[in-house]
Each structure stands twice: as structure tokens, then as C-alpha cells.
Amino acid sequence: VRYFGKEHAEEVMQLYRDYYYAYWEQKSADFPGLERQFIFHDLRYARVFKQIGEGFECFSSNPLKDIIRERVPGRSFRIEGNNQVDSLLSGMERTFDRFDKVAQRCAQLMPQLPEQYRCFFLDNLSAPCHYMAALSHSLYHFLRAYKYTEKRTKNLDLSIEYLEKAQEALYSTQHGVF
């Protein structure tokens, strides 16, 4: 109510919930009752891009390695399944669809919000949601380029296009004093 007005508080609350639930849960929780213990957040995206990018020409179904100082084997990514690439492709496909839907709802709500609430809504929810949608699409196409060499150029072009959209979402939050 405080940040978005009484009229839109419930809808915004649901958008926040759906945004956080859009993240891919790549591994089931280790602790009972600890819902969504493992989510695939943006730092993991960066590590996937980096690690696969470094060995892009030599396909491996399990290309991701633990970060150097990791004390627990397998903890860096915690991806369930025998094939990291297929698990990531499946996870990103579900994830970008969920982020796309929440981003679309954010875009529909934005003009309905009173002017004084729009900047905070953009910076705190709408832009991050658009960013994660685009980043998820980008990683999906990057992984497809890595796995399917016959359509590598097309998928890399799409990956770059979505990275540029992700960058635009970040830039949309660069404005005057909040």
C-alpha cells in the first residue's frame, strides 16, 4: 500500500511473488520446509556464459565446473540430472516463459500506477523482471548454439539480441535522483 497505493497493492504483491517464483529451481531443497532453497540467479547465469564460452568449440554435456575455492563438490551450480546442458535448456525454457509473463503484466500495470509510484516500480520490479526474462532467453539461445552447431549462428545472433534487451532493461533504471 505504501509504495503502490491501496488500489494496486494486491496486484503488485502477486507480481513480486510471481517474479521470485519465476527463477528456475535447479535442485530440490536439501532441508524439509525450506522452499526454493536453490534458485538459478543471475550470478550463476554469468558463470555459465563464462565457463561454456571458454570451451565453446568442444561440446560437453557437463561443461560446468565448481568455482576454484568451492569446499563442497558440486555446490557451485547444483544442477540435477545427468546432463547439465539439457537441464539448463529445459530450465531456461520454463524460466523465460515465466519471466515473460510477469514482465508483460508489469508493463500493463505501469501506466495504471499513479505517477509518484512508477519510478520505484520500474527500478525495483519491472526492470529486473524484464532483465531476467531477456537474460534467460539469451542463455537459452547461447546453450542451443553450443549444443546444436548446425544453427549456431542463428542462435548466437538471438543470444546477443536478448543480451542487448537485458542491457536496455538495466539502462532503464539509470535516471535522476530517486
Feature locations, PLM:
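Substrate-binding groove of N-acetylhexosamine-processing glycoside hydrolases
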Residues: V1-F178
